[in-house]
From Swiss-Prot:
It is an enzyme of class 3 (hydrolase). One of its GO terms (biological process) is meiotic cell cycle. It comes from the Eukaryota. One of its GO terms (molecular function) is ubiquitin-like protein peptidase activity. Deubiquitinase with endodeubiquitinase activity that preferentially cleaves 'Lys-48'-linked polyubiquitin chains. Shows only weak activity against 'Lys-63' and 'Lys-11'-linked chains. Has a role in meiosis. One of its GO terms (cellular component) is cytoplasm. The record marks 161 as: Involved in the stabilization of negative charge on the oxyanion by the formation of the oxyanion hole. This is Ubiquitin carboxyl-terminal hydrolase mug105. The active site is at residues 42, 165, 183. Signal peptide: none annotated. Belongs to the peptidase C78 family. ZUFSP subfamily. It comes from Schizosaccharomyces pombe (strain 972 / ATCC 24843) (Fission yeast). Keywords: Cytoplasm, Hydrolase, Meiosis.
Amino acid sequence: MSKCLQQLKRQLQHFGIDGCSLADGDIDYFFTVTGIDRGWGCGWRNIQMLISWLQYTNPNWFKRNFSSGNYEINSLQSLLLSAWMKGIDAEGYAQLGDNLHGKWIGATEVYSLFTGLFVNVALVDFDFRSEASASNALFLYVKKHFESSNDTSNVSPCYLQFQGHSIIIIGFCSSLETLVVLDPDRYQSVQKKFVNIADFNHCYMRKKRSLKFSQFQLVHFKQNIFLNDFSSKLEVRSTRISDF
């Protein structure tokens, strides 16, 4: 499904939901497929969504890096291997190895792939004693991120990793205290024509109670979005938010 943000804005208006700060630009929805990548492909599908956002907001960068227009999973696997060969996250390469077919990836691999494409990536680790503290810190960070819009840079979507799954956050809704998300495992829901607000919220909105984890990893693009050189980012470093 293409141009999800435009469609989402219309649906928010239709249901009278206000107070939502969304990513700038637009984004296409990619989903896992049973028998192909369901169970391991969520990270790759989320990368596709982030690339589509860059295609809308930075078309010249997209043309340089994806001149064929192809960013299927096998192409992304080659890009991740290329980033590792450049020396980015040698530890991750040692763990996953050369054959990425059918392999689940996480936030550090997202960091590595985009760094290899000279995109300036922020990686944030949330590590708390309690699930409530972790979700409170996550929601506060995401709220600030999406409310930081200005005239000189685009506010990007976020990649959110938690136990066993990952999703894309495309906004924050203050009136509902929810994350606005695209879940690569919820194709049927996203494709629906919503007739009531409950179904719409179930598909796109995530409250704290639906994210009961004590650890999260978040990836987003920085406001100075491109790098001239990534030699200082070969080792994966994160911002740690914790109560330990």
